[in-house]
Amino acid sequence: MQATLIVVTYNGRALLAQCLPAVVEAARRAGGHPVVVADDGSDDGSAELVRASFPDVRWLGLPHRGFGETANAAVAAAETEAAVLLNSDVLVAPDFLPPLLELLLAQDVFAVGPKFLNPAGSLTDALGNRTSCRWHRGLLEIHHETRPERLRDPCAQLYANGGAMAFRREKWLVLGGFDPLYRPFYWEDVDLGYRAWGRGWQVLYQPASQVRHDQGSTMRRTQRLSYVELMSAKNALLFAWKNLLDPALLRRTLAAQARWAADDVLIGTPPPRTRALLAALRQLPEAARGRAREQLERVRSDHEILAACGASP
């Protein structure tokens, strides 16, 4: 199976200089897979670096539209059966690719995620491993497995982390890729995995493939922490409104949101979660359209999706 390795970047010249040698070498060792840098409107000399230092890497320069839409354009432009999406702050192991592609050979598999390690090579604070979700005070929260004994074998997971994921292009295109509802960033990969499960496909975790990820380093360089947290909270709400088709689960979520909105009114000054709610409400019509599409196309219930990937309903 041939795969296009796509590195998405935005003003990440220094990160590209660190990550691309490993990506190019991994692609070569796995049999010669194409490598593409999909650029989200950088103006820091990234193009000059890639063209001068990595002549075999294709440069795909795009207008600044955010991570999700840049990834979508790059996947659409690829011509291989599979694709591998990588953040520029990810360092891949030399042999990371074959184990991912091996699991993709099954026709019902949409995506496969590797084992994520921190920059020091340990599991401490590493996110993206054997993902699932849990309910906390009525709200859906993403869970990342951290116990080594539960990260030894391939298994199902809720979604493949967008920082490093392999997938079948045809299924990606059927799903429509990352939904721009979640602009500018965060939760688009959760949404994609949930929708794939809803179509009857699988998302798997493959610990035999390893990458090191400096979680959030790109965001720290380009965005304020308060803004990142606001967008993450907003998109968590939009995910629930769009994807939870089970009436009881949606009622549970809406009731929890109403409770903390009322608490915030009593406090008097809008805390981040109230600002997130107001921001999400501005996108409610867009989320409703996505929900209508899901109602037409889904073949698994919410409970079946959550059970299949080991999540708690």
Q: What spans do the regions from the language model cover?
A:
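A conserved acidic beta->alpha catalytic loop
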Residues: A22, D39-E48
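Short, acidic, metal-binding catalytic loop of nucleotide-sugar glycosyltransferases
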Residues: A22-G32
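Glycine-rich, basic loop-to-helix element that forms the pyrophosphate-binding segment
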Residues: G61-A78, S88
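Short aromatic/hydrophobic "clamp" motif used to bind/position activated sugar donors
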Residues: A83
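Conserved donor NDP-sugar-binding/catalytic core segment of glycosyltransferases
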Residues: L91-T131
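Short, flexible, basic/aromatic active-site loop/helix in glycosyltransferases
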Residues: C133-Q157
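A short, conserved alpha-helix in the catalytic core of glycosyltransferases
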Residues: L158-G176, L181-Q210
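Non-catalytic, C-terminal membrane-associated alpha-helical segments of glycosyltransferases
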Residues: P247-P313
